[in-house]
Amino acid sequence: MFNTRANKASDQSPTIPTESATLAELWERTVRSRPSSPAIVTNGETLSYDEVNARANRLARLLLDEGAGPGRLVALALPRSSHLVISVLAVAKAGAVFLPLDVNHPRERLSYQLADARPALLCTVRSAAARLPDGIEMPRVLLDSPERTAVLDALPDTDLTDDERGGPLAATDLAYVIYTSGSTGRPKGVALTGAGLPALAAAKVAAMRVTGDSRVLQFASPGFDAYLTELLAAFTAGATLVVPGTDTLAGDPLRRALRDGRVSHAVLPPAAVATMSPDAVPDLRVLVVAGEACPAGLVERWAPGRLLINAYGPTECTVCATMTGPLTPTDEVTIGRPIPGVSVYILDAERRPAAPGEIGELYLSGAGLAQGYLNSPDLTAQMFVPNPFAADGERMYRTGDLASRRADGDILFHGRIDDQVELRGFRVELGEVESVLSQHPDVAQAVAALWTDPAEGPQLVTYVVPAPGTTPSAGELREHAGRFLPDFMVPSAFTTIDAVPLTPGGKTDRAGLPDPVKATQPAGLGPRTPAEKVLCDIFRDLFDLVEIDVRSNFFEMGGNSILAVDLIQRAQEAGLTLMPRTVIDHPTIEQLAAIATLEE
């Protein structure tokens, strides 16, 4: 039995029983009730629920023929597209496990994920296949090849039977694996069942007031679990999922995606929201912010005239654990209360319930808890612990987040216990950044930190103790980091220090680190080509400068991934063609100009 007394002492909501349904079953219910309604809008194409279902059924049969099936992983190396949505549904229909990969991540990172997960199949398209690492030894399904298209067209498009799958679907079966940042220097795969999906879907649809007339933005990166929130919020309500045809969504590209797609509902990280004006997206009636702490100023700007909700949840608890009610401009920003199907505990160091107002560690339990970390039994045992407030055999997840409970029951977030941070909606283990930089031969020690620039907001920065007799440059370190880390984990500043400051207990004293040093910019070399002139003008505007040199480094001037999106967009408007990772690999004006294509 649930320990109601302990639960009351912690002022937690007990786990509420919810229906058992798989992702495929949730989807197929809507297909039966709204077959002709628009399910996906992308690049000028509209697909009905019936059309998407038929394509997913054909692909599911192809995947089964190629070796997919219950318990087997299928890697999806696909950009944001209808291909990705249909592939997720197809894997679910086949009873297999989908592993989404972000093809914009470094090849070394993708290679590690594939080697660690060992999927039975890899699905991709021609545009994404070129970005994958070499030497992938697994069957590959190229979805847009003429040969595969012909095979798919010949397959039946009816819903699959249990006989075809080799058994019935079960919500408690492994459904998907998501890789998140890991403190050891390697990302870790979180293995989740579908047991928490029905409660998540019901909570999102109810809180966001999604109806069949709603248009929900598909914003999240394919490798980020918020992707599932968007699919579930749209598809369980019979709404339309708006899928932009671009990998870069912040600032003007995000504003245009919302405006052109007539998006009414979106789930966005606060950093992306902050790149727009509320007045620029009048159709956006419902906005959920999630992925990082929500500033009070953002609530003040965005709450008037629309439904604004703050949500919280780690990957290990099926995307979302708590949500607020509708926020007003003057509200204190909390992370709300647990959604149905989730229990929340705030405990002290002895795992006893914290008193109201007392800060403790946040623990989560419920049907949506992950099975654990792929191939990491020790880490799983460390983070998923027995739940003393519930029936024998139940577990709870140690989030590592600090929280307290207000008198009204809402939960306040107080940061992290460990070295994990949230940056622009992404989870970053500082230890992973430090581990990667420490592998550079000229680095004796590296410390990563989150530093708030008064003008530019939170920045990921690093401090490096050079190996004896070496002087690694910021450019060398950035290039090294970019080989192993995704864009959002590449530091924006590299500061050389003689030694890492320590606390009296011998631990790294992050508070004792100096302010990061931005490299002195060279002066005197002006633009020599039309492309360099265009980029110099953009750099001046982005960094509010009068003079600039073509050897100026974007990141050493304070640039970050959000500003990089702005840079790429402005360059494209001026006729320069640049790709998302271009700025990481070629951060100076002269380097960017040398590889950019200038349209006449």
Swiss-Prot record:
The modification O-(pantetheine 4'-phosphoryl)serine is found at S561. The keyword Ligase applies. Its EC number is 6.-.-.-. CDD domains: A_NRPS_CmdD_like. GO terms for molecular function: ligase activity; phosphopantetheine binding. One of its GO terms (biological process) is amino acid activation for nonribosomal peptide biosynthetic process. Keywords: Antibiotic biosynthesis, Ligase, Phosphopantetheine, Phosphoprotein. It is an enzyme of class 6 (ligase). Residues 505-526 are annotated as: Disordered. InterPro entries: AA_adenyl_dom, ACP-like_sf, AMP-bd_C, AMP-bd_C_sf, AMP-binding, AMP-binding_CS, AMP-dep_synth/lig_dom, ANL_N_sf. GO terms for cellular component: cytoplasm. Residues 526-600 form the Carrier domain. Pathway: Antibiotic biosynthesis; novobiocin biosynthesis. PANTHER family: FATTY ACID SYNTHASE (PTHR45527:SF1), NONRIBOSOMAL PEPTIDE SYNTHETASE (PTHR45527). Belongs to the ATP-dependent AMP-binding enzyme family. Together with NovI, involved in the formation of a beta-OH-Tyr intermediate in the novobiocin biosynthesis pathway, an aminocoumarin family antibiotic that targets bacterial DNA gyrases. The ATP-dependent AMP-binding region activates L-Tyr as L-tyrosyl-AMP and then transfers the L-tyrosyl group to the acyl carrier domain through thioester formation to form a tyrosyl-S intermediate that is covalently tethered to NovH (L-Tyr-S-NovH). This is Novobiocin biosynthesis protein H. It comes from Streptomyces niveus. The gene is novH.
